[in-house]
Amino acid sequence: GVGFKAGVKDYKLTYYTPDYETLDTDILAAFRVTPQPGVPAEEAGAAVAAESSTGTWTTVWTDGLTSLDRYKGRCYHIEPVAGEDNQYIVYVAYPLDLFEEGSVTNMFTSIVGNVFGFKALRALRLEDLRIPPAYSKTFQGPPHGIQVERDKLNKYGRPLLGCTTKPKLGLSAKNYGRAVYECLRGGLDFTKDDENVNSQPFMRWRDRFLFCAEAIYKAQAXTGEIKGHYLNATAGTCEEMIKRAAFASELGVPIVMHDYLTGGFTANTSLSHYCRNHGLLLHIHRAMHAVIDRQKNHGIHFRVLAKALRLSGGDHIHSGTVVGKLEGERDITLGFVDLLRDDYIEKDRSRGIYFTQFWVSLPGVLPVASGGIHVWHMPALTEIFGDDSVLQFGGGTLGHPWGNAPGAVANRVALEACVQARNEGQDLAREGNEIIRKASKWSPELAAACEVWKEIKFVFEAMDTL
């Protein structure tokens, strides 16, 4: 007879190992698992470990040619989710040897590959990953990081200000450049290509790059400050993307941009390496993230996509605004903001952080708050995000009744007022509106902005709860 026992496997015999002591080199994953009715938690957890590592549905004779114990993923802990009747957090440990060095693509193909279509599960969500130093050290990470960016731009002690150029599609390159110039001249640090501006018939990329570079140099000459515009280098092929980044580099501008999820991790990592080699900062937009992270029970939480970006490389990444939303969501957002910026982040389940993460001097990423914010939000944003952030006001700049430059002035005055008030010991949360009102007395631009966006409040339920 054959020398192995053929037949369909009972996963939990091999892959459920509650006594396993995790190694410092293991990649650890926390999955939110919703099994099909009648599937026990241990079997579901073991199935996740198996399907995302070495397992297949039946015993194969080639199993005998390798050491499964060395290479298999292990489900080492299961805990029920409070308030849900059939949902579990399943912890899986993966041996480091399963992953190619320096490849986010390969890491995700294994951990969030076929397993998400597995029939025994109703739903599956990857909540968090612990990336061990042994693996993170195989990545270059962000092209420059927070400190180098501040030194390049000569801007310290405050958040940076940005603005997305609108209308996002339809402007000619020259008019687009005019809009950029007005914003930068008024006091913003950056303007931004919208994520869907690539190279369309009404505005080809090379024309846009040229007119935006002209706007940058003109605004720098006028203000004596270093300016930037996130030139979106995202393209249909990696070769074309690098060509666009190279043109930006030739123009001498400080920063380019990439849509990292639609562009893909392989393209993003290539661009990130190019940016470090050529002294370009890299701004990352997360278009498509909600397709992956919005459902509570299925998909991948954004904190994992954020960690993946820090490995793949980017100097800025969009990370939500928090403002006016519920407290729980604030804690969770600040959790992944810390994962982006800090070197060492303690496990803290109240902030959605399932594992202690130690990046070991991998450069940090600036979180970008963007979307629906205006001058009245400035005190809250300054308090929540602190100095190491980029605050982006698209409509909150361009919607100013007097035009782009006064809109930029209003935002800069509001920001400087908030930073000064904070440094003098005022409580931004309590006295925010008063600080803005006081500043608007000597800035007609800010006063006009305050009038347009009277103290608006957002009233939606939090999507992202624990």
Swiss-Prot record:
Reaction catalyzed: 2 (2R)-3-phosphoglycerate + 2 H(+) = D-ribulose 1,5-bisphosphate + CO2 + H2O; D-ribulose 1,5-bisphosphate + O2 = 2-phosphoglycolate + (2R)-3-phosphoglycerate + 2 H(+)
Site residues by UniProt (Transition state stabilizer): 325
Entry GO terms, CC: chloroplast
Lyase recorded as keyword: yes
Any one of the GO BP annotations: photorespiration
GO molecular function, one term: monooxygenase activity
Binding site for Mg(2+): 192, 194-195
Cofactors required: Mg(2+)
Cofactor binding, note field: Binds 1 Mg(2+) ion per subunit.
EC number: 4.1.1.39
Residues bearing the modification N6-carboxylysine: 192
Sorted UniProt keywords: Calvin cycle, Carbon dioxide fixation, Chloroplast, Disulfide bond, Lyase, Magnesium, Metal-binding, Methylation, Monooxygenase, Oxidoreductase, Photorespiration, Photosynthesis, Plastid
Highest taxon, organism lineage: Eukaryota
Binding-site residues for substrate, renumbered to this chain: 114, 164, 168, 286, 318, 370
Family annotation (SUPFAM superfamilies): RuBisCo, C-terminal domain, RuBisCO, large subunit, small (N-terminal) domain
PTM annotation, UniProt: The disulfide bond which can form in the large chain dimeric partners within the hexadecamer appears to be associated with oxidative stress and protein turnover.
Predominant localisation class: plastid
PTM sites of type N6,N6,N6-trimethyllysine: 5
Residue numbers annotated as active site: 166 (proton acceptor), 285 (proton acceptor)
Subcellular localization, as worded in the UniProt entry: Plastid, Chloroplast
Other remarks on this protein: The basic functional RuBisCO is composed of a large chain homodimer in a 'head-to-tail' conformation. In form I RuBisCO this homodimer is arranged in a barrel-like tetramer with the small subunits forming a tetrameric 'cap' on each end of the 'barrel'.
Protein's job: RuBisCO catalyzes two reactions: the carboxylation of D-ribulose 1,5-bisphosphate, the primary event in carbon dioxide fixation, as well as the oxidative fragmentation of the pentose substrate in the photorespiration process. Both reactions occur simultaneously and in competition at the same active site.
Family as reported in the entry's similarity comment: Belongs to the RuBisCO large chain family. Type I subfamily.
Protein name, as recorded: Ribulose bisphosphate carboxylase large chain
Gene, per the UniProt record: rbcL
